[in-house]
Amino acid sequence: IKSSAASDVYKRQGNIEVDKQRTEALLADPKENAEHVMLVDLARNDLSRNAHDVQVDFYKEVQYYSHVIHLVSRVSGEINTDSDPVKTYVDTFPAGTLSGAPKVRAMQLITDIEHHNRGAYGGCIGFIGLDGDLNQAITIRTFVSRGNVLYYQAGAGIVAKSNDERELQEVNNKLGALKKAIDLAEKLIN
């Protein structure tokens, strides 16, 4: 079983040298690093419920996407012989990147604070095979179409040292690719 912890979003600038500087700043940012440690710990705890020999395969690998820079770690383990894929799925969901820690209390706070249900956002899409294989991906940075209206959303990890303006900027950075897709679609229509 494998789980990826992706966090710590910095906006890409489209310039190799500037992106390199932003990557160095991201790797040196104490708040972003503390947040990432929390997410890796959550993934380790989640996998340990149904797996043994849980380990971190790679830690804080820099990954570049069209609009953002992420730190990504992968946690894996060997599924226990008595584990069942559905229970394993339930025990690892929702991902810590969307709940925070401690997970149960964080989910209670999200339910109390957020004004509406998250819908597909933060859920997952995937499959459970007849052979017991399970594969899922978190539905973030995704459009949902209802009644001829497109909906999309993003969030940011709030921790003790969070800065409101930086967290809002992180949300906007995450939405950059979706906004660009809308702009391109509008140009095609017009």
Where are these regions (language model features)?
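Extended alpha-helical targeting/anchoring segments
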Residues: 7-190
